From Swiss-Prot:
EC number: 6.3.3.3
Name of the protein in its database record: ATP-dependent dethiobiotin synthetase BioD
Major location (coarse): cytoplasm
Annotated InterPro entries: DTB_synth_BioD (IPR004472), P-loop_NTPase (IPR027417)
Catalytic center residues: K37
List of residues binding ATP: E12, I13, G14, K15, T16, T17, D54, E116, G117, A118, G119, P205, R206, L207
Organism for this UniProt entry: Pseudomonas paraeruginosa (strain DSM 24068 / PA7)
GO cellular component, as recorded: cytosol
Oligomer status and interactors: Homodimer.
Keywords: ATP-binding, Biotin biosynthesis, Cytoplasm, Ligase, Magnesium, Metal-binding, Nucleotide-binding
Ligand binding (Mg(2+)): T16, D54, E116
Residues binding substrate, per UniProt: S41
Amino acid sequence: MPAFFVTGTDTEIGKTTIAAGLLHAARSAGLSTAAAKPVASGCEATAQGLRNGDALALLGECSLALAYEQVNPLAFEPAIAPHLAAREAGVELSAARLHDAVREVLALRADFTLVEGAGGWRVPLQGRENLSDLARLLGLPVVLVVGVRLGCINHALLSAEAILGDGLALAGWVANIVDPATSRLEENLATLAERLPAPCLGRVPRLADAGPAAVAAHLDLRPLGIGL
């Protein structure tokens, strides 16, 4: 069943917003959905344990019955880089450990599954490992969320180069307009479309309501080979 790894050109550029929108689009088409965000920092302490807003957003768009811990097996309270949070907590943060956790979700064989990373492509784990090593172990095609603002072309092209250099397929990309005041916006988008070696799955404007349904209206799953 189709599964994809979602990464972004940076942190705070709307990876989860886009991932939840993609899941919603799949659900609306009658597909079963599942998701994983294997590591998250900036979590809130609740009576049920640490909870991350991004992981909860993904869980809300999963049609399969998943426990929170299946979606987000490693949660850390400090809003810092995951490898620093794990080090402070004395927790192993290896690509192999995350891989084993994600495989449990993939084994459910939903019609459409997303695995969302943290930050960008080269976010450190432990030792010399990066989150990209998890993506390589999983072998999933990648969806790149481009936070459209000044500097995004360089970030997007470098990210795409790294993804392909790691031997993974770039299945598609999404233009998420995080700064509508970006100078020469249309020209920037045209350059991205010309230079990125993958189809664009949609252009998401800055929305007053950035809920999954509103975002899904601007996305197209067909370039991913998903029949709708």
